[in-house]
Amino acid sequence: MSMHLKNKLGLDWANEKYIRNLYQELGIKGMKPVFKTTRAGKAPYGKFPYLLRNKFIRFSNQVMATDITYIKTPWGMMYFTAVIDLYSRKILSWRLSDSMKTDFCLECVKDAFEEYGVPAIFNTDCGSQYTSAAFVELLQSYNVEISMDGIGRCKDNIFVERTWRTLKYEWIFLRDYSSAEELRKSLGEFVKFFNSERIHQGLDYKTPDEVYEASLITNRLKTKPMAA
């Protein structure tokens, strides 16, 4: 918060001590994320190994990941899925559904691949949507290496979990929604905010868009042919 006020609003006096005192004065307390434990679905292809342990991610589009989070609304449960670039934390694509069917997960992945290209590795948890034949075969059709978290190991997909935490505690819980369309519009606004405005400490206080684009430029320069 302090870095956001300094970098984005020019409030150099807003240090961490000021923010802590302000939170105490307003009665604001930090919230701890509650991680879900994923149950493995029926897996016609079995469970794929987790490929990201000790893996150094060097550039954008090298590794993408996805997951589903639940949004409780007055008219029932809604389900939000997104594909995230793990190097930059950028949300590449997203979908909202009123059911947990695999279809909206498939469409979300297709959206990301069509707009941003195909990664070397794609990581998921081992939920039924991601271990289904349709999902596995989609990734295999793109020759993508499939990586899956261990059951109950939310830290294997920690950057996606942190995105859900930001979505819930900095956006969803601060707003009221009266319809699915209103929620959908708000989620689009969140994605724009998250990608282009919200700075991340883990990204050296840059936004996902800034890191993503800088990585693409660097890669273009590396692959640019030398003049004769």
Question: Which role does the model predict for each range below?
Answer:
Residues 1, 19, 52, 67, ...:
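Mobile genetic element proteins and their domesticated derivatives, centered on retroelements
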Residues 1-60, 207-216:
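Basic, flexible linker segments flanking DNA-binding modules
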Residues 15, 48, 61, 80, ...:
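Hydrophobic (often cysteine-bearing) scaffold residues that line and stabilize catalytic clefts
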Residues 39-43, 124-126, 132-136, 146-168, ...:
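RNase H-like two-metal-ion nuclease catalytic core shared by retroviral integrases
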Residues 57-92, 98-100:
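An active-site-proximal beta-strand-loop segment
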Residues 72, 76, 94-116, 131:
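Active-site beta-loop-alpha junctions of metal-dependent nucleic acid enzymes
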Residues 140-144, 166-228:
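C-terminal domain-tail junction helix/linker
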